Structures are given as C-alpha cells and as structure tokens.
C-alpha cells in the first residue's frame, strides 16, 4: 500500500466517508462540464427535482461538437446546435459559469481550466471526459467520469470510488533533440501496455519531468488513461507556481503565499512508499509513432513494425488485427508511410508551446502536394497568443489551414473527419478504429513537430532531419 504520496494526501483530505459498499465517498473540488456528457445528467437532475449543489465549483465550455471553420450560429449540424443550446440552458438555469464561443475563454475543457488558473495543486477534479487526467500535471487528482457520475457530482459534489494503488514512473536525464513530451508518454505506454496501469494512479517523477514546462507535463498526464491508469500526476514545484501566479482564478496577495505553503505540504514525501516503481532513461526515448489501433502500438520513427513473435502473447491478437486494418505488415518501416491528412491540435497537443514547436518545422517550408494539413488551437486564448507571435502566418505561408478552437479531428463529433481509407498524422491521443470519423480511416499518433514534418514530407519522417 502506498504511503505519504501526493495521491494519498489529497485522497484522504477529500474523503467524506466510507460507504456500506466499501467505496470511498470523495468530495470533488472542481467539476468541469461540456456539451456531450452533460445533457442526460442535467435531465436526470430535473426528473428528480434536484439542483446543482455547488454551481460555484462547476465550470462549463463547449468543445467536442464545435466546427473549427464556420462557427456562425445556428450551426449547420442541427444536432450540434441542439447540444450547445442545451448546455446554454442548463448553465443558465443552474447559475453555472459557461465559457461560450466568442467569450475569449472558450476552448477544449482541459486547455481552458489550466490557463484560467482553475486547475490547482491538491484539488480533486472530475469531468465527463476520458482525458481529465491532464490536470494531474498540477499535482491535482483528476478523474474522467461517465454521464451517471456527472449526475452524481452535479447533485452531491461527490463520487463513489475505490482507492487506487500508486505507481511511480521515473524518467531521468535530458531528452534528445527532436524528442518531446508526446514521445515520452507514447514510449511509456508502449513499454507498460494499454492495460498496464489498471488499478493505479501514476506519479510521474524524475529529472526529465522536472525539466518539462507545464504544457509538456499536461501532455504526459493527458495520456495516463491510455496506459490504463485512472489518473496521472506530477508533484507541484516552482514551475507549477510560476505558471499559475497571476492567472484569473489563482490566489492573490497573501492568499498566494498561503496557497504555495499548502501546495508544498501535499507533495509526496521523500520517504513515500509506492506500490510499484518503474524507471526509464530519457536518452532511450526516440521520436515515436504509433503504427496500429491502440496507443500502445508505437515504435521509434526509424524502427520496423514488430513481428508477432516479438510481442507478448496477449498482444498478438490485437497486433494481427492492426496489421489488417492499417494495411501494414510486420518488418515494414513506419518511416516513409504516405500521409493524407495532418492534424495539429487536441487536449493533448493544442497548447501554445505545441504550436511553437510545430511552427519551427513549418517555417520556410511547404506542405507536400496532396496533403491536407491544419492547425487547431486548443482555446481562444491559445489562438490569440499564437497570432500575436505570428504563428498563424507561418503555418498559412507553409500551406496549413489555421482554424478556430475546438476538439476537431481528435474525434468524430464535428465536421473535421477523415474520408474513406485516408491515413492521418495526428497529435491527438487515440488511434482507435474509426476514431477520426471514417469507419476505415487510419491514424498515426505523434508529436506536433512530427506531424508538421509529415506534412512537409508527405510521409512519416524523422523530425530530426528538419531541425
């Protein structure tokens, strides 16, 4: 059993009690809401005559279904328009803060909460979205939940949960040029498997994470769920505090000093006990690309697609399925795979530093003929900041489309979709069958800089050759 970890401390501080089932009733400090998983939850509250218990701890935005080109209302997609109208109504009726399109603060929920300073160390955070683990980058314990649990949090501000074990994942050393936070998490998932973290919270530690900025840490924590972990986190430090200070909802003045003192106290103790510890060397991590239909099917850009006998027996069936679906074969280089669509964005990699790294590759170059490439900022604030630096002009000059904020091609809930057997280079987080809108479309996950490289070369290529 873990002891003295940040997870233990935050869990214990937010425990309301133990239910007859043995589950812990956990208080949720911040509930983030969007248009897809909330309508049914609000409807269930209405049926029971209930109101949102703590509207001041609830914040909403619209992200999944919003078009990234024509955002004029009403939306062309009738269902999307109905969903945003429902969220507008539900927030108004329950006095919930709602950041709508054009507010200056709209964007992907896991991008706007940190940039507003809503996400803070030591919090418990829930959202009806798988990638809520992103907020763990701040030393928060953040869970993705389903619609019925969204209802529970709206009504009671609590969740019924089993306490997780804690695995410490240590990565030490400096990353090589051309290797980014996305490569780190893809490498971890590749090594431990998509089910390796089931029953665990992941604590990311080591000198590599200490050297990362907050947006890089968010990328890693975002994909903890893809490795099976319910949540992932990094202990807060000066990097965290420098990011938060002065943001809209961050403590101010004397309250700031008190907050930092408390945040320091909830960090994992030096002698904390973990259920498991796994250590990686940053120098061993290459620019990584997924070749299959799970985020765990990744290889270095210069490596070959694995032979079945190289895999664990339990992974071979999915590998055989992936070979067929992706139309790739064992022993084939992933480098040189032709690309049709390049997507830079998502809650994994749609922040300012992600766009900056991709722009370094795009600057002075051109998107290859026949490739559709587009960049979708993660929020209105990210878009404004990027345009202030001229990143939009760099991308457009290179032949990329510059879009409005939203989840975009990460998932098939808006107009940005693959067609037929198209294959994409994507900075998003999931490469499941049909994930990007076509039942036969294919997705290769990689860092934003690697996506930009693929766009320029028209195929999977090594970003280090363009640095």
Curated annotation (Swiss-Prot):
Biological process, per Gene Ontology: L-leucine biosynthetic process
Family note: Belongs to the aconitase/IPM isomerase family. LeuC type 1 subfamily.
Cofactor binding notes: Binds 1 [4Fe-4S] cluster per subunit.
Pfam families from the UniProt entry: Aconitase (PF00330)
Membrane-spanning intervals of the chain: none
Domain of life: Bacteria
Function (record text): Catalyzes the isomerization between 2-isopropylmalate and 3-isopropylmalate, via the formation of 2-isopropylmaleate.
Names of required cofactors: [4Fe-4S] cluster
Involved pathway(s): Amino-acid biosynthesis; L-leucine biosynthesis; L-leucine from 3-methyl-2-oxobutanoate: step 2/4
List of residues binding [4Fe-4S] cluster: 347, 407, 410
UniProt KW keywords: 4Fe-4S, Amino-acid biosynthesis, Branched-chain amino acid biosynthesis, Iron, Iron-sulfur, Leucine biosynthesis, Lyase, Metal-binding
InterPro entries the UniProt entry points to: 3-IsopropMal_deHydase_lsu (IPR004430), Acnase/IPM_dHydase_lsu_aba_1/3 (IPR015931), Acoase/IPM_deHydtase_lsu_aba (IPR001030), Aconitase_4Fe-4S_BS (IPR018136), Aconitase_4Fe-4S_dom (IPR036008), IPM_dehydratase_rel_enz (IPR050067), IPMI_cat (IPR033941)
Signal peptide: none
PANTHER family: 3-ISOPROPYLMALATE DEHYDRATASE (PTHR43822:SF9), HOMOACONITASE, MITOCHONDRIAL-RELATED (PTHR43822)
Subunit structure: Heterodimer of LeuC and LeuD.
E.C. code: 4.2.1.33
Catalytic activity: (2R,3S)-3-isopropylmalate = (2S)-2-isopropylmalate
Protein name: 3-isopropylmalate dehydratase large subunit
GO molecular function: 3-isopropylmalate dehydratase activity; 4 iron, 4 sulfur cluster binding; metal ion binding
């Amino acid at each position: 059993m873990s002891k003295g970890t940040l997870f233990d401390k935050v869990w214990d501080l937010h425990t309301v009690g133990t239910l007859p089932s043995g589950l812990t009733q956990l208080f949720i400090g911040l509930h983030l809401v969007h248009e897809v998983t909330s309508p049914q939850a609000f409807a269930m509250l209405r049926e029971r005559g209930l109101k949102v218990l703590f509207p001041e701890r609830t914040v909403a935005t619209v992200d999944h279904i919003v078009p990234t080109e024509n955002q004029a209302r009403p939306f062309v997609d009738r269902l999307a328009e109905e969903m945003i109208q429902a969220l507008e109504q539900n927030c108004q009726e329950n006095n919930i803060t709602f950041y709508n399109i054009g507010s200056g603060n709209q964007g992907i929920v896991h991008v706007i909460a940190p940039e507003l300073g809503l996400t803070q160390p030591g919090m418990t955070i829930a959202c009806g979205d798988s990638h809520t683990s992103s907020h763990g980058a701040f030393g928060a314990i953040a869970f993705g939940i389903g619609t019925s649990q969204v209802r529970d949090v709206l009504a009671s501000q609590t969740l019924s949960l089993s306490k997780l074990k804690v695995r410490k994942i240590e990565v030490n050393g400096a990353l090589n040029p051309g290797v980014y936070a996305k490569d780190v998490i893809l490498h971890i998932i590749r090594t431990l498997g998509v089910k390796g973290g089931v029953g665990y919270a992941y604590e990311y530690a080591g000198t590599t994470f200490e050297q990362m900025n907050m947006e890089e840490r968010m990328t890693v924590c975002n994909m903890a769920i893809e490795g099976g972990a319910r949540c992932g986190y990094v202990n807060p430090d000066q990097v965290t505090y420098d990011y938060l200070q002065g943001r809209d909802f961050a403590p101010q003045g004397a309250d700031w000093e008190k907050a930092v003192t408390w945040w320091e106290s909830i960090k994992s103790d030096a002698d904390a006990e973990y259920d498991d510890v796994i250590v990686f060397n940053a120098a061993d991590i290459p620019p990584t690309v997924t070749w299959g239909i799970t985020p765990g099917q990744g290889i270095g850009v210069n490596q070959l697609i694995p032979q079945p006998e190289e895999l664990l027996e339990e992974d071979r069936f999915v590998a055989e399925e992936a070979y067929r679906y992706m139309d790739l074969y064992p022993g084939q280089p992933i480098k040189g795979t032709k690309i049709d669509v390049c997507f830079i964005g998502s809650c994994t990699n749609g922040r300012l530093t992600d766009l900056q790294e991709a722009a370094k590759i795009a600057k002075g170059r051109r998107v290859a003929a026949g490739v559709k490439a587009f960049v979708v900022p993660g929020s209105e604030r990210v878009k404004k900041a990027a345009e202030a630096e001229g990143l939009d002009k760099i991308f457009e000059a290179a032949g990329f489309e510059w879009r409005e904020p939203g989840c975009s091609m990460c998932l098939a809930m808006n107009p940005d979709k693959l067609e037929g057997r198209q294959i994409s280079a994507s900075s998003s987080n999931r490469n499941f069958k049909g994930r990007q809108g076509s039942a036969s479309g294919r997705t290769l996950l990689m860092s934003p800089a690697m996506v930009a490289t693929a766009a320029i070369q028209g195929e999977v290529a090594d970003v280090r050759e363009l640095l």
